[in-house]
Amino acid sequence: IHAEDLAVGYDRHVVVDDITLDVHPGGLVVLMGTNGSGKSTILRTLAGLLEPVSGDVRVLDEWPGGRAERVAYLPQHPKSLATLPLRASDVVRMGRFARLGLIGRATKEDDEAVETAMARMSVLQFRDKPLHALSGGQQQRVHLAQILARNADVVLLDEPTAGLDAQ
């Protein structure tokens, strides 16, 4: 990720400006700040969900969103899928959709990625449970497993531990 003199916000309203950032492969950056300070806006811009107000930003040498199959983003409050009849394993499998495309068929590699991600997040026991039957913390772990299953080159997590217990 490379950003120089980046300003982010909504429409022309700047929330955070003068952002200069370089994150190299294997790098880790933690954004810290008070509520409403613009952390989520920065992440949404890097994920390609918001246009930058000004400045230059590249993710994997492309404009944000240009390499969507290689970037995984978990918002602070994932959209509730609880109204859909989805099992936890279905939600985790959605992490593979960016690589499969609309008509791609899951392979053994996809199945293994889903199993491995669910095991890493300790949610294998919920595999066949409806998402809506899980607690908020369990749902968050399922969403984190979805991100892991994606095997993305860039992972953007917005408050990923919100609602999780100490284990």
Task: Give the label of every model feature segment.
Residues 55-69:
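Conserved ABC transporter NBD signature motif
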Residues 47:
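Helix-to-loop junction immediately C-terminal to a conserved catalytic motif
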Residues 155-159:
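Catalytic Walker B motif of ABC-type/P-loop ATPase nucleotide-binding domains
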Residues 93, 108-126:
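Conserved ABC ATPase "signature" region
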Residues 1, 15-16, 127:
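Conserved structural motif at the start of ABC-family nucleotide-binding domains
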Residues 32-34:
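The feature captures the beta-strand-to-loop junction immediately N-terminal to the Walker
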Residues 130-134, 138:
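Conserved ABC ATPase signature
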